[in-house]
A protein has these predicted regions:
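ATP-binding Walker
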Residues: 14-15
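Walker A/P-loop
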Residues: 18
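Glycine-rich phosphate-binding loops of nucleotide-dependent enzymes
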Residues: 142-151, 156-159, 164, 192, ...
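Hydrophobic anchor at the beta1->P-loop junction of P-loop NTPases
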Residues: 7-9
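Small-molecule kinase domains that catalyze NTP-dependent phosphoryl transfer to phosphate-bearing small molecules
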Residues: 70-71, 108, 115-121, 128-138, ...
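N-terminal phosphate/diphosphate-binding loop that engages ATP/GTP or pyrophosphate donors
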Residues: 26-92
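ATP-dependent NMP and nucleoside kinases share a basic, alpha-helical "lid"
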Residues: 86-163
Length: 223
């Protein structure tokens, strides 16, 4: 793992992490890991199997059946007991449950080995909340995204409009503020920038400028 370049992208919700991660992956040809999908996998399994409480034995059973498989498009498929469950993970119920599961320290710890197994040649873009602080502290380049609440709410609003929803901007702002509070102040792996992370405020920067900046930082880190 030490010889494979890793770039971590952490930061606030709707700050641009996912967009820039995909662009970096396409530009560099690196695999891309969205760590949130692993918590969604646990959430989906909990819902489907009617699990009430995560005991040590149940967590071990799930981990034994859970695999993450690299795809040709540089993403990963989530396999559980030989079934591809990836397409089932992106609904509201699963997302809400995943938010609760992400606070479980036992689950976060057992997922470390799965996330480490995602390190593949020629490199990995790791997108999440604690990629640079806990999962890949040895990463060659760590980026932390931030942006104003107004800008992030507007971005989320526009995303929902494009998807056919009828969102309320004020409600989105409230939701983001609540999520920030939970992410930053939670006891297990709170959201924060790694000490050696480059902090990028994406409020006033366009995506091309940000991409060029990170690519430049990557080239410097390779020297």
């Amino acid at each position: 793992m030490n010889n494979v370049p890793i770039i971590t992208i952490d930061g606030l919700a709707s700050s641009g992490k996912t967009t820039i991660s995909k662009l970096l992956s396409n530009h560099l040809g690196f695999y891309i890991l969205d760590s949130g999908v692993l918590y969604r996998a646990f959430a989906y399994i909990k819902i489907m199997e009617n699990i009430d409480t995560y005991t040590v034995d149940i967590i071990a059973k799930i981990i034994n059946g859970l695999k993450i498989v690299p795809k040709k498009d540089l993403g990963f498929s989530i396999i559980y007991n030989s079934n591809d469950i990836t397409s089932n993970l992106y609904n509201e119920e699963t997302g809400l449950e995943a938010s609760n599961i992400s606070k479980n320290e036992d689950i976060r710890n057992v997922l470390l080995s799965i996330q480490h197994a995602c390190v593949q040649e020629p490199g990995l873009i790791a997108n999440g909340r604690d990629m640079g602080t806990k999962v890949f502290p040895e990463a060659m380049l760590k980026i932390y995204f931030t942006a104003s609440i107004d800008v992030r709410a507007k971005r989320r609003y526009e995303q929902l409009i494009k998807s056919g929803s009828s969102p309320n901007l004020v409600n989105i702002q409230k939701s983001l503020k609540e999520r920030d509070e939970k992410d930053i102040n939670r006891e297990v792996s709170p959201l924060k920038a790694a000490k050696d992370a480059i902090i990028i405020d994406s409020s006033e920067l366009n995506i091309d400028t940000i991409l060029d900046k990170i690519l430049g930082l990557y080239k410097i880190s390779r020297v």
